Amino acid sequence: MSAVTNTLVHDLFRAIDSREFERLREICHPDVTYERPGYEAFSGIDRLLKFYREERVIASGDHLLTAALVDGAFGACWGRFVGKHRDGSDLDVEFADTYEIEDGRIRKRKSFFYRPAV
């Protein structure tokens, strides 16, 4: 297990939860791909940033990680997201992510939720 890449997963959620989306340029590979239920895959860092800034249905909240495991170029994490939808409703959702890591950055992320299209 690599402490550097484990930190990368935690850094990803800190940047997202604090809405410091520009930090994702340091954390994610320029050619990042992100797959999540309810959306077409996001390809490239600029497309990912557009999603977080303009399209995401989540207004605010925190990812509470139960665990993050990384082995070489692959990783996974799971936990719970607690926050607010843009419509004002409360969110409390279990999730799991898988990662592919290239050149010290997240190259591919795939999210799984225990409810439809969060």
Language model feature labels by segment:
Residues 1-26, 30:
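Short, low-complexity N-terminal intrinsically disordered segments enriched in polar/charged residues
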